[in-house]
């Protein structure tokens, strides 16, 4: 038993029922009844007609049993090692007392400042050494030989 689908309403058409409509371009449509056929021929949109399957699908009618509650993904905190530091090292640092951590931070800052000062001092000495030889040898002015030419002969120009 072959069951067709109505081209307009979307309902099943059982054998012995419905009408077939062949357009001049060769496309064939099956309609459940004259109501569907007349609605199709008057160019009505099945998505805007309440009783059609397309309307019910568009407006989500009659699907309440199938809908499951959407599960939201929850972010789970996970601790793992980072490159250059193992998990044990990270946990040890985290469990340190704040005073110890503060002292370590200050010591690191002090060391960085000292290194910066040393770098600047070495830079200063290098600059002073570079400047000294330039002052010792001043350049002498080159005297260009003046070309003595014969007196000009002629008029104004």
Swiss-Prot record:
Residue location of crosslink Glycyl lysine isopeptide (Lys-Gly) (interchain with G-Cter in SUMO2): 2, 27, 35, 147
Compositional bias segments (type: Low complexity): 123-140
Modification Phosphoserine occurs at: 86, 149
Residue ranges, annotated region (Disordered): 106-157
Gene3D superfamilies for the chain: 6.10.250.1270, Ribosomal protein L24e (2.30.170.20)
Residue list for modification Phosphothreonine: 83
Keyword Thylakoid: no
Keyword Ribosomal protein: yes
Modified residues (N6-acetyllysine): 27, 77, 93
Top-level taxon of origin: Eukaryota
Compartments reported by the entry: Cytoplasm
UniProt-listed GO biological process terms: cytoplasmic translation; exit from mitosis; optic nerve development; retina development in camera-type eye; retinal ganglion cell axon guidance; ribosomal large subunit assembly; translation
UniProt GO molecular function: cadherin binding; mRNA binding; RNA binding; structural constituent of ribosome
Cellular component GO terms, alphabetical: cytoplasm; cytosol; cytosolic large ribosomal subunit; cytosolic ribosome; endoplasmic reticulum; extracellular exosome; membrane; synapse
PTM (free text): Mono-ADP-ribosylation at Glu-4 by PARP16 inhibits polysome assembly and mRNA loading, thereby inhibiting protein translation.
Compositionally skewed regions (Basic and acidic residues) per UniProt: 106-117
Residue numbers of N6-succinyllysine PTMs: 131
PROSITE patterns: RIBOSOMAL_L24E
Keywords: Acetylation, ADP-ribosylation, Cytoplasm, Isopeptide bond, Phosphoprotein, Ribonucleoprotein, Ribosomal protein, Ubl conjugation
Chain positions with ADP-ribosyl glutamic acid modification: 4
Protein family per UniProt: Belongs to the eukaryotic ribosomal protein eL24 family.
Described function: Component of the large ribosomal subunit. The ribosome is a large ribonucleoprotein complex responsible for the synthesis of proteins in the cell.
Subunit relationships: Component of the large ribosomal subunit.
Protein name per Swiss-Prot or TrEMBL: Large ribosomal subunit protein eL24
Source organism of this protein record: Homo sapiens
The organism's taxonomic lineage, starting at the top: Eukaryota, Metazoa, Chordata, Craniata, Vertebrata
